[in-house]
């Protein structure tokens, strides 16, 4: 598991340095049947995001959807915690929606399930209200008056 943790830390570092444009290091960690899920699927996007994304080709579609709609402003890793078959990444991220130019910033948690040294499941937890606001799906708090 320590090797996976080190490779995961390197993948996040490359992702952050590229501002969300080079997911290749993540692909190297995936099992062929990886399942990518996001809290945003149900709470914000509904069926529009098309998740969960199952398999490496679907994972590519996931990252393509992000690249087409969002620009990473910054991201940082605060901790990577491993226990049994789970690895949890804890950090912060800021993204700008390319259509609305609104930003969403805040804590982010990714939960990875690992078997035989490969990621078989990934769950992303990020600010669903902030994402909906950046997409123009809900009004800014200050605009409600």
Where are these regions (language model features)?
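Short, low-complexity N-terminal intrinsically disordered segments enriched in polar/charged residues
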Residues: 1-32, 140-145
